[in-house]
């Protein structure tokens, strides 16, 4: 069950949990999917994938000031679980100290991905994030899919 400040997305991806986990934890892969469209660019400024390590991604339209997302890795259980804090700046509805949990489970040779993004300050903030995550996951799926 989710409350009105929690976003939950599930997807079955035609790739191994290891492959899906890798795109969440490598600079080059993150720069491929961490953007809202083909006219956006992403730059991973900091990526220290360990509990207590930090990440920082600048992304947005090519010729504009970037949006900035950053946080700290709270839990890592490769290739099954990744939990991190997330703060977003540079947008109309910024947020601070939300929590993103990514769970990956092997299911019939594929990966069942469950993403839970919680602790938004308001339902409007959650709705804003719900516009971005599906596209991010679409790009992740294209990066790792065996059928594409």
Language-model segments: residues:
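Hydrophobic pocket/interface hotspot
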Residues: 20, 30, 55, 73, ...
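A generic structural micro-feature
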Residues: 3, 47-49, 63-67, 92-96, ...
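A short, structured loop/turn motif at beta-sheet edges
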Residues: 17-18, 49-50, 74-81, 103-112
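Charge-dense, helix-prone N-terminal extensions
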Residues: 4, 10, 18, 45-46, ...
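Short amphipathic alpha-helical signal-transduction/dimerization elements
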Residues: 25, 137-148
